[in-house]
C-alpha cells in the first residue's frame, strides 16, 4: 500500500491507494475513487491534491514505491515532496461544451502578451495589468475592436474612439478607478516614446484604460500607483501570466470573496480551420455575503452566505480577444454576450456596478501609415458567428470563477476578504471532478 500525507498548519490528511481504490480521508470525511489502476492512480492523486493545496499553503509528502521525480515532486529523504513551482493549474472548473486552449487563458490567442505589476502592503492593494494584442507596434498596426457598456457606472477611458473608428491603437491597461489618469498618462508616454511621429507628423493617440473600484482593500485616495508601475508591467509582457489577486485585480472583491484577474479560452473550429476566442476579466461585483453566487450551475451562495451583506455593486471589466476575422460590428455583437456569462455566476448588474466590455480581433492589422486608398480585409460571414457567441459566454463565466478560485485571502486597510477556498469543503466537492493542470 502507498500512503500520501498532506500537511498544513493544523491537520494531517491521509490518502491511501490499495489495489484498485484511492481513498481520501479529509477532516474525518471519506472520499473514495474506485475502478482505477496503478497507471492512472498517480494522475487521480495529483489532480486532487494539486488543486487542494493551491491556495492552502500546504505541503504534499509522498511515501511509497512510485518514483515521482518526473511528476512535479522533488526527492525528500526516503520520500518525495510536491514542488508547487513546477505545477501550472490550467483549469479548476469545467464550464460549457467547448474545448479550452492549452493555457486556458487569453494568451492562447497567438501573439497576445500580458504583463502585471502588483502592489500589496498593509495599506495598499492595487496594481495594473497590461494586455498587448500583438508583439508589434500597436499604434502603427492597429487591431479591429468594439466596446459595449452593459451598465455605465464606470470611468473607463478610450471608448468614444473605439466606437467611432473601430480600432485599438495602444495596449489595454486594467487598474483601480482612481488610478486611471496616472495609468493613461503612462500609456500615452510609452506610445510617444515608441512613435515619435505622434503629435508632429500624425495625429494623437487614444489610450485604453479599464477600471474597477478597489477601495474596499486599497487606500485609493492616495493614488499610490505610479507611471513606473505601468512601465514595469509593460516590460514584463509575456505569453503567460498569473490570475487572481494580481495586477489590476489586487484590490477587487467578487460576490463577497476575493476577486480580481481571471481568464479562460475556447477553441472554435470552422471547416478545417481552428480559431481561439479568449476572455480576461477583472471581477469586482456581486452581493457581499455571497448569497447570489452560482458556481458551475449550482447555487453555492445558499451554502456559504456568511459574510457581511451589501448590495450587488462594484464593477467588472471584460476584455475579449480572438483571432477570428471579425469586423467591429461583429465584435460588438460578440462582446454583448459577456453579460450572459456574468449573469450565470449570479450577477444582475446592480445600479452601482460598472459593467464594461471591450473586444478585439488580431486577424486584420490596420496600418496607420499607408498611401493606399483601399485595404483588403477578411471577414467571417455572420452565419458562422454562433460559435463565437457560445465561446464568449462560456469563457466569460469560467473567467469570473477563475478570478475567485485563483485568489487568496487578502487584508486591506479596512477589511479582510477571504478567498473562495476558505469554504474548502464545499469548494472541493464542487470542483474535484474537473481539475486540470499542465504537465
Residue ranges and their predicted role:
Residues 74-439:
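Alpha/propeptide regions of enzymes that mature by internal proteolysis
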Amino acid at each position: 500500500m502507498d500512503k500520501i500525507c498532506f500537511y498544513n498548519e493544523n491537520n494531517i490528511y491521509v490518502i491511501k491507494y490499495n489495489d484498485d481504490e484511492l481513498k481520501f480521508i479529509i477532516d474525518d470525511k471519506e472520499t473514495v475513487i474506485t475502478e482505477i489502476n496503478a497507471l492512472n492512480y498517480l494522475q487521480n492523486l495529483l489532480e486532487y491534491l494539486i488543486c487542494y493545496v493551491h491556495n492552502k499553503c500546504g505541503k504534499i509528502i509522498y511515501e511509497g514505491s512510485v518514483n515521482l521525480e518526473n511528476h512535479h515532486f522533488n526527492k525528500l529523504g526516503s520520500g518525495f515532496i510536491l514542488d508547487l513551482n513546477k505545477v501550472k493549474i490550467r483549469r479548476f472548473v469545467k464550464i460549457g461544451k467547448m474545448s479550452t486552449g492549452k493555457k486556458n487563458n487569453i494568451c492562447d490567442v497567438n501573439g497576445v502578451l500580458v504583463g502585471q505589476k502588483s502592489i500589496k502592503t498593509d495599506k495598499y492593494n492595487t496594481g495594473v495589468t497590461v494586455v498587448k494584442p500583438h508583439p508589434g507596434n500597436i499604434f502603427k498596426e492597429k487591431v479591429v475592436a468594439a466596446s459595449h457598456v452593459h451598465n455605465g457606472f464606470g470611468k473607463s477611458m478610450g471608448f468614444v474612439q473605439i466606437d467611432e473608428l473601430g480600432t485599438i491603437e495602444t495596449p489595454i491597461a486594467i487598474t483601480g478607478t482612481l488610478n486611471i489618469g496616472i495609468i493613461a498618462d503612462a500609456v500615452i508616454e510609452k506610445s510617444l516614446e515608441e512613435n515619435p511621429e505622434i503629435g508632429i507628423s500624425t495625429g494623437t493617440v487614444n489610450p485604453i484604460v479599464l477600471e474597477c473600484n478597489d477601495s474596499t482593500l486599497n487606500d485609493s485616495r492616495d493614488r499610490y500607483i505610479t507611471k513606473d508601475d505601468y512601465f514595469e508591467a509593460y516590460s514584463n509582457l509575456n505569453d503567460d501570466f498569473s490570475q487572481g489577486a494580481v495586477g489590476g485585480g489586487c484590490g477587487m472583491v467578487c460576490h463577497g470573496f476575493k476577486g480580481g484577474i481571471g481568464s479562460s479560452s475556447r477553441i472554435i473550429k470552422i471547416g478545417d480551420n481552428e480559431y481561439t476566442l479568449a476572455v480576461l476579466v477583472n471581477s469586482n461585483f456581486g452581493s457581499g455575503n455571497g448569497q447570489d453566487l452560482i458556481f458551475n450551475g449550482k447555487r453555492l451562495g445558499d451554502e456559504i452566505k456568511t459574510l457581511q451583506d451589501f448590495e450587488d455593486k462594484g464593477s467588472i471589466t471584460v476584455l475579449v480577444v480572438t483571432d477570428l476575422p471579425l469586423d467591429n460590428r461583429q465584435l460588438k455583437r460578440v462582446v454583448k454576450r459577456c453579460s450572459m456569462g456574468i449573469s450565470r455566476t449570479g450577477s444582475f448588474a446592480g445600479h452601482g456596478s460598472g459593467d464594461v466590455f471591450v473586444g478585439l480581433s488580431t486577424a486584420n492589422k490596420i496600418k496607420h501609415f499607408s498611401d493606399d486608398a483601399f485595404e483588403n480585409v477578411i471577414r467571417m460571414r455572420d452565419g458562422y458567428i454562433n460559435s463565437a457567441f457560445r465561446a464568449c459566454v462560456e469563457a466569460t463565466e469560467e473567467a469570473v470563477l477563475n478570478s475567485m478560485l485563483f485568489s487568496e485571502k487578502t487584508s486591506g486597510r479596512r477589511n479582510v476578504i477571504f478567498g473562495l477556498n476558505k469554504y474548502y469543503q464545499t469548494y472541493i466537492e464542487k470542483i474535484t471532478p474537473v481539475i486540470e493542470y499542465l504537465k
